[in-house]
Amino acid sequence: MPCFDSVYTKEYAQQLDAVDPLARFRNEFYIDEDSIYLDGNSLGLLSTRAEQSLLDVLDSWKQYGIDGWTKGKHPWFYLSESLGEKMASLVGAKAEEVIVTGSTTTNLHQLVSSFFRPEGKKTKILADELNFPSDIYALKSQLHLQGFDPEEHLIQVKSDNGHLLNEEDIIAEMKEDIALIVLPSVLYRSGQILDMERLTTAAHQRNILIGFDLCHSIGAIPHQLRKWDVDFAFWCTYKHVNGGPGSVAALFVNEKHFGRRPGLAGWFSSNKQKQFDMEHTLTPAEHAGAFQIGTPHIFSIAPLIGSLAIFAEAGIEQIRKKSLKLTDYMMTLIEHELSDYQFTIQNPRDERRGAHLYIEHDEAARICKALKEENVIPDFRSPKGIRLAPVALYNTFKEVWNTIQVLKFIMKEERYKKFKNERDVVA
C-alpha cells in the first residue's frame, strides 16, 4: 500500500494505480483520454475484444450466408447456450442454468408468466417501491393478463428513507397471499445490495418462489445463485458486462425447475434436436434454453464473446475488490473536498454497496451538465441524484481524484448555474 502523508493527494492516487493488478485491462477499452467516463453502470465501454467478436460474426455472415448458423468461428445456432456457459461463473450457476436471450423486460415477462401460478389465497406478487420502473410495468402487466388488479395484487415494500430497503420489512410482507417475489439484487439508485441468500431462505420457508433482477450487480459483484437456491434471475449485459447498447440480456433458472413449461413459448424454446422437425407440438429444451422465445439477435449478442473473455481473465473477485477500493476512495475524497457544498452520500458506506456511488444535491441536474462540459461523464437520476460509477476494468484512482477536483471547481466557481436544473431527454 502506498505511503503518503495524505490520501488526498494526486500522488497517492497514482501509487494506487501503480499497484493495481487489473490495470492492464484498461488498454483493451476504447477510452477518450481527454475525458473521464463514470457511466459504466448505464452503458459500459467498448473493448477491442468485443469489437473483434462482432467483426468475426459479420465475417461469418459474409462468408457463409445461411450456413453461418452452424459454421464459422462462432456458430450462431449455439451462441445463446455457449455464452450462457461462459456467463454462468459470474452468477454462481451451472452452465445449463443460464441462457443469453431477449431483453431484461421480455425475460421478466417470460419468467413471471412461467413462475406466477396463482392458486387459492396465493394471488399476489411482492416487489418494492424503489425498483426500476420497467420491472414494475412488467409485473403490473402480468397481473392484468391474469385478470388481477395490480393496485390490489402487487405489493410494494416501502422504504423508510426513499433510498434503502430494510430486509426485515421485506420478510414481514412475505404473507400467505404472496405467490411470487421479484426484487433487485442492487438498487439502481442507492446501490444497496440486498441479502439475496437471506431473502431466498425466508421466501422458501413460506412456500414462495423468488427471483432477482441482477442488472446492477452482474459483472460487478460475485453471486452464488445455486448456493442461495434462487429460483430465477434475469439481467442486462450492456452495463458492467460491456456488451454494447441494446446487447442481448440473460436469465437464470434453477435446475430444480427444469421441465417447467415456459409461459411464453416460441421457436427457440425448442429442444435443438427437434427444432427443425417443424412439429406444432413444442418439445421444450431440457434446460434454461426452454425460456428463450425467438431467434437470438446475433449482432447484439456477438460482442459478449469478447467481453466475457475479459471477465474470465480478470476474475469477478478481483473486479469486486478493486471496485470497493475505488468507491471507498471516492467517498473519502467527497467527504474531505466537498464538505462545504451540501452533497449527501446516499449509498451504503459499508460493503453492502454495489459498484456505483449515489450522491444527492438540490442542483444535481445542473451539476451533471457542468461535469459533462468539463469532460466528466456522470449519470443523473431525477429529482436530485448523481450516480458515479468508477469501473474496475477501465477506470483509475487518478481519474477518481481528478473527478472530485473538477467537481470542487464547478461548485466553487458556480459553473453549474448557467445550466437549467432539469434532465435531458436521456438522463
UniProtKB/Swiss-Prot annotation:
Pyridoxal 5'-phosphate binds at T104, T105, F132, P133, S134, D135, D213, H216, Y238, W267, T295. It is an enzyme of class 3 (hydrolase). Its EC number is 3.7.1.3. One of its GO terms (molecular function) is pyridoxal phosphate binding. It catalyses: L-kynurenine + H2O = anthranilate + L-alanine + H(+); 3-hydroxy-L-kynurenine + H2O = 3-hydroxyanthranilate + L-alanine + H(+). It comes from the Bacteria. The modification N6-(pyridoxal phosphate)lysine is found at K239. Disulfide bonds: none annotated. Keywords: Hydrolase, Pyridine nucleotide biosynthesis, Pyridoxal phosphate. One of its GO terms (cellular component) is cytoplasm. Its cofactor is pyridoxal 5'-phosphate. Pathway: Amino-acid degradation; L-kynurenine degradation; L-alanine and anthranilate from L-kynurenine: step 1/1; Cofactor biosynthesis; NAD(+) biosynthesis; quinolinate from L-kynurenine: step 2/3. Pfam families: KYNU_C. One of its GO terms (biological process) is anthranilate metabolic process. Catalyzes the cleavage of L-kynurenine (L-Kyn) and L-3-hydroxykynurenine (L-3OHKyn) into anthranilic acid (AA) and 3-hydroxyanthranilic acid (3-OHAA), respectively. Belongs to the kynureninase family. Homodimer. This is Kynureninase. The gene is kynU.
